[in-house]
């Protein structure tokens, strides 16, 4: 198929470009993008004129039809308004992708399903047609992009220059030594945050020493990834299994320090393996540099401390301190950590959800463990009053989950965002000076009562979109050893 060759749909199911454009705001129409999530976010996977998606589209990659079970498919379809009685339009790169989902929808009783047979490339080629995309999509890279880079190519949205790839985790060099992506160096989060200071970011002098020892300058393009593995939240160091969250923690601190271009591999190690790309076992040592190039921190606004968190709380109209924690943590049933005793929440915060426990982020990821479609994330935040016009700081227990959500806000182009570094660990240690609440907040209790639904310890009624995935890929690794010192 040539670049602009239309996808051929049946005449009775085809929808024209003009009609589709005229119906972009039709509340009775669900437009479904079945391309890979990277394309939806903004990557030009087929070299099209523009990247992104048709405004108002919901993402349902065709790969989900074979990667998750039938019950999960039904839930994902329903959560996106792809249900019987709705009008649905499908579009993609490949006619086979559309045909497969069209057949599945027919089996689910959807009769009003039409195909945008001109295809995405035709839409993208017309500058008069609107396109939406993730504002900073290029900071969330996909496996093919990284493969091209490692093979010496010039992938899209990369201007050349020096780059480094890091396998990130919390104190498990054995995982890196078992195997890792070709050319990757090892990065222990303990080199960037301090276990002796409740895992807050290290001092500017320590960060300067750490990044220089890793060969990083402010102008180095840094790509990070992690490996999510099976484990028990009650084991001594469960954070060692949350590789992708660890990678976003490293990313946030590197951006705070002053690295201009830091990117995350969406899906991490698992997606590289799924693509069939090679791994290596060679332990690579970094080449230190003499100077980082700028003073640290260059972006102090990206990570804030307790006084700034209190200032944000004092400005309820123009700011939001967002709790990226489970509902049980939020209402004080559990602390979420085996090393944090007190349970509860920061008084005046806004609940932002996370996943099943302190080491999972399913609420922010898809069923295949990549970033959840950003319109869903932003819509959920908006329902809670978390909007880009406000000063928003995210917190969790020690900054990891907060870093992942901070990164998603950064990808969406939000500018006044931060991680409250000390989080619940710091706040809960001084309840006399730091107000704490437990129980269901009054506004959420009212929403529950108004809905007429029970609230059996889970998130309050009315949460938008898909909840925790039940099929995120997992692999097994060793338990690891004690944290290593800064190199």
Task: Describe every region a protein language model picked out.
Residues 1-487:
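Cytosolic catalytic domains that perform sulfur/thiol-centered chemistry
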